[in-house]
């Protein structure tokens, strides 16, 4: 038993005594990105993620930095879903959440709005 404890103590001492070096990251490619936005406690992650992707793509393509309104997209998506629910006589989906391509549907059919104009 003493041999096991002594061996364990020596192993722990050896591990602690090994040279510690600090790894430094190097930037291989730096991609521009828009600031992080807070969706609070809304079920709109689908919209925030997709709009963030579109903003990042605009930056990547050299089109400039945009801050697009996520809540404008959400509002128009819910209006469409309410109309759908009415046409289905109450059997449509009007709960939180949606899918990413609804952002492109709103973009194609209604358009997009800057955050400073429509902050929701």
Model regions: which residues?
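Catalytic-core signature of thiol
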Residues: 20-120
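Bacterial Sec-dependent N-terminal signal peptides
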Residues: 1-21
